[in-house]
């Protein structure tokens, strides 16, 4: 079994750019950014429970990494960058810490490196279970209306919230809930030490209005790019800023 993905081919000899979306997104999420890099072959992946991979279920990050690796093999991708937002960034960091063959580097936008104590994990598990129950039982428009009121999304205006609620409500609530629980921050290990000891290039993107993840970025041994005029979802709020940072990263 492999994950559903959309492949766009560029010039031979360059590494692939493998894009991983955030929770409740899909393979279209990164395409505005990715299509600015037409020289590179691009793979836009649907993570389990989402888009064309909605029927694929996993028990945890190990399953996601295994599926991602099998997907890369199926496309004969031998050299690649992982580019991930939020959940996709966490998947990218988890996979990269497994020393993937052919990995050139990782670019994470607003991805959490992991909670650092049992109390934080227990609180996050309670919260994610409550959200999962709502995704399973309530209309998605109502759930996402509340989801986008969370503090991390304070930079969004009312029109942006309404647009995201309408877009994300096309998902399957049951499969979203399953993925939320399987890849909860509560079950993700703290990756700070692994990332510090890494052998791959590591870059971190965060919006200038995303104070939480700017603080987290400062804890990581990564080159940080602050995206102007953007909050947590920087590639949506300022795609040109993210394109500029990614172009700078890929020039090295």
UniProtKB/Swiss-Prot annotation:
It is an enzyme of class 4 (lyase). The keyword DNA damage does not apply. GO terms for biological process: menaquinone biosynthetic process. The keyword Lyase applies. Pfam families: Abhydrolase_6. It comes from the Bacteria. One of its GO terms (molecular function) is 2-succinyl-6-hydroxy-2,4-cyclohexadiene-1-carboxylate synthase activity. Keywords: Lyase, Menaquinone biosynthesis. It catalyses: 5-enolpyruvoyl-6-hydroxy-2-succinyl-cyclohex-3-ene-1-carboxylate = (1R,6R)-6-hydroxy-2-succinyl-cyclohexa-2,4-diene-1-carboxylate + pyruvate. Coiled coil: none annotated. Its EC number is 4.2.99.20. Pathway: Quinol/quinone metabolism; 1,4-dihydroxy-2-naphthoate biosynthesis; 1,4-dihydroxy-2-naphthoate from chorismate: step 3/7; Quinol/quinone metabolism; menaquinone biosynthesis. PANTHER family: 2-SUCCINYL-5-ENOLPYRUVYL-6-HYDROXY-3-CYCLOHEXENE-1-CARBOXYLATE SYNTHASE, PROTEIN PHYLLO, CHLOROPLASTIC. Belongs to the AB hydrolase superfamily. MenH family. Catalyzes a proton abstraction reaction that results in 2,5-elimination of pyruvate from 2-succinyl-5-enolpyruvyl-6-hydroxy-3-cyclohexene-1-carboxylate (SEPHCHC) and the formation of 2-succinyl-6-hydroxy-2,4-cyclohexadiene-1-carboxylate (SHCHC). NCBIfam families: menH_SHCHC, PRK11126.1. HAMAP family: MenH. Monomer. This is 2-succinyl-6-hydroxy-2,4-cyclohexadiene-1-carboxylate synthase. It comes from Escherichia coli O17:K52:H18 (strain UMN026 / ExPEC). The gene is menH.
């Amino acid at each position: 079994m492999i994950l559903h993905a959309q492949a766009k081919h560029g010039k031979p000899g360059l590494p692939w750019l493998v894009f991983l979306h955030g929770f409740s997104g899909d393979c279209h999420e990164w395409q505005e950014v990715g299509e600015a890099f037409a020289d590179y072959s691009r793979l836009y992946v649907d993570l389990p429970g989402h888009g064309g991979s909605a029927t694929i279920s996993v028990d945890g990050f190990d399953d996601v990494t295994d599926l991602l690796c099998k997907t890369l093999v199926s496309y004969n991708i031998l050299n690649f960058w992982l580019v991930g937002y939020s959940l996709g960034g966490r998947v990218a960091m988890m996979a990269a810490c497994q020393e993937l063959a052919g990995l050139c580097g990782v670019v994470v936008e607003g991805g959490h490196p992991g909670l650092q104590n049992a109390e934080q994990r227990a609180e996050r598990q309670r919260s994610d279970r409550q959200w999962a129950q709502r995704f399973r039982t309530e209309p998605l428009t109502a759930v996402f209306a509340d989801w986008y009121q969370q503090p991390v999304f304070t930079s969004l205006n009312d029109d942006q919230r309404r647009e995201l609620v309408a877009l994300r409500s096309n998902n399957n609530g049951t499969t979203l809930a399953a993925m939320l629980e399987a890849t909860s921050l509560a079950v993700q290990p703290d990756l700070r030490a692994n990332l510090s000891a890494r052998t791959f290039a590591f870059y971190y993107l965060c919006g200038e209005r995303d104070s939480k993840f700017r603080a987290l970025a400062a804890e990581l041994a990564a080159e940080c790019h602050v995206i102007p005029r953007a909050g947590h979802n920087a590639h949506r709020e300022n795609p040109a800023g993210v394109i500029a940072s990614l172009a700078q990263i890929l020039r090295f």
